């Protein structure tokens, strides 16, 4: 599976999580790319909750991605910490 990041995602993910945690997220998506809930009316964008640091999923991160099934590609689009909201 190929991962493609938008420039804004790349910038955000370096601030939001360490490299080893991002690798865990990528592995989780390789194993279950359908894990994120589809955002209604988005054309297939998905939002996944991901724990961050010492906090659980509820206080962690939200990451937006698109899974292109025929191309076997995940586009990492955006992310934010729930604490930023």
PLM region spans:
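Short, surface-exposed coil-to-beta transition loops
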Residues: 58-63
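Short, charged/polar low-complexity linear motifs in solvent-exposed/disordered segments
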Residues: 29, 64-65
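Enriched for short, Lys/Arg-rich terminal
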Residues: 67-85
